Amino acid sequence: MGLVCSRNRRYRDSDPEENAQAAEIERRIESETKAEKHIQKLLLLGAGESGKSTIFKQIKLLFQTGFDEAELRSYTPVIFANVYQTIKVLHDGAKELAQNDLNSAKYVISDESKDIGEKLSEIGSRLDYPHLTKDLAKEIETLWEDAAIQETYARGNELQVPDCTKYFMENLQRLSDANYVPTKGDVLYARVRTTGVVEIQFSPVGENKRSGEVYRLFDVGGQRNERRKWIHLFEGVTAVIFCAAISEYDQTLFEDESKNRLMETKELFEWILKQPCFEKTSFMLFLNKFDIFEKKILNVPLNVCEWFKDYQPVSSGKQEIEHAYEFVKKKFEELYFQSSAPDRVDRVFKIYRTTALDQKVVKKTFKLVDETLRRRNLFEAGLL
């Protein structure tokens, strides 16, 4: 509407400078509007802890200039917070198990570590965390290596223990160095809940050159209280990239410990599929955290999740991993085709096996996504 008005406006002959400025502004607006039409919007959605924000960070590393030193340093307090919060969760979890579990003895923290544990638990309760010094790192290492804490860590799925735990606990001496600057790997493991909306613009890199497509990717808060903020992004979206952490079939939500994470993911996926504004939107489903899934499935049966209660294991080892993965994949396919006819050509649906922390996997996946969306665009233009 603004463009139409500006084109019809008569410039005053008495002020050539003002006329020139107005004409330049009009040219810029028109240019930006045309450029915007060529940018495809991707909406990155998923429940909390699905790994979508790690995907977002990988895009920045893969298809942009990455993180400069200032950005890397900005993650230092986040990483320290992850360390302190995690060791507190493990300490407090061990104490609870020592009181209530049938095998309570193995969760009793050793006398040598008790005082350290209480100190670190208190630090983990603060609003402001101290700088991670060598002395504090040594104390955290001592508690981490305690047998009771290791037994508790083995039951991390019951205690909201984050996926980054082992990585940071094994790098404490480096993290506590006086001149510490987070690495790209540290940033990828750093856990901070997305609130609100963040965006990034990129063009995927193929084997020989950049794709001709330009994408704007929006990452939206995954926790329940963030979802009401999504609605203004829905219109005009080329595709939804939905992240589902398939390894979390035996875990509960951070914000509601009575709710299984995969059940929440199922319900969220169903809800998104039913939104009228996604009637013709393509869906790229990332079955994420496969690296954790393939280890867990050999020890924790898939049917502990209500959604997968009809699952029947077939064997062990790699064959069982693939069988379980295909079962989960089929469940998501069934959800999708409940809302979309299988023979529809105006709405693309693809499923990808992903590990957000694996840069090669993410790069390959986005190359495939790019190819899929480019083919869809050619089809819509009548060129296929």
UniProtKB/Swiss-Prot annotation:
Binding residues annotated for Mg(2+), in chain numbering: S53, T194
Region annotated G3 motif, chain positions: 215-224
G-alpha domain mapped to chain residues: 38-384
Gene Ontology terms describing biological process: adenylate cyclase-modulating G protein-coupled receptor signaling pathway
Disordered: annotated segments: 1-23
GO molecular function: G protein-coupled receptor binding; G-protein beta/gamma-subunit complex binding; GTP binding; GTPase activity; metal ion binding
Signal peptide bounds: none
Binding site for GTP: 49-54, 163, 188-189, 194, 222, 288-289, 291, 356
Gene Ontology CC annotations of this record: cytoplasm; heterotrimeric G-protein complex
Ranges for region G4 motif: 284-291
Region G5 motif, annotated ranges: 354-359
Keyword ATP-binding applies: no
Cofactor list: Mg(2+)
PROSITE patterns per the UniProt record, alphabetical: G_ALPHA
Domain of life of the source: Eukaryota
Keywords: GTP-binding, Hydrolase, Lipoprotein, Magnesium, Metal-binding, Myristate, Nucleotide-binding, Palmitate, Transducer
Region annotated G1 motif, chain positions: 41-54
Lipid-modified residues, S-palmitoyl cysteine kind: C5
Lipid-bearing positions (N-myristoyl glycine): G2
Region (G2 motif): 186-194
Domain notes: The helical domain (69-189) is required for self-activation.
Family: Belongs to the G-alpha family.
Function, as annotated: Guanine nucleotide-binding proteins (G proteins) are involved as modulators or transducers in various transmembrane signaling systems.
Subunit structure: G proteins are composed of 3 units; alpha, beta and gamma. The alpha chain contains the guanine nucleotide binding site.
The protein's name: Guanine nucleotide-binding protein alpha-2 subunit
Name of the gene: GPA2
